[in-house]
């Protein structure tokens, strides 16, 4: 007798498996990308942790410890880079003041456009995504 793929039990098992795979991918790729961007733009941070966050994509503590939501992996790379650069700028400016936004937009001129798009995504499992290479160069249009 086969398993009903539409049963609640099967759906929960599939969701658990998807989350585990997503987390494993995030634990590999996000720290690598963060280190690459930090080096490129001369930021220093203390540590990076990848885990599930309930309502945000990332955070940076006063000690420059960066935490990233593993659901970032479902976003296009432009948005992932937006979040990573945002957290790196917090290593220089903790609050979202004028200096923060000037520094952020000096690195990512299309930040406002990407931020608007990012607000349409949620910090949970997204059924499908289209991502380009992590080496994609942002264009003037931002996407």
Each PLM stretch: what is its role?
Residues 1-82, 91-143:
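Active-site-proximal or metal-binding-adjacent scaffold patches in catalytic folds
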Residues 87:
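Walker B catalytic acidic pair
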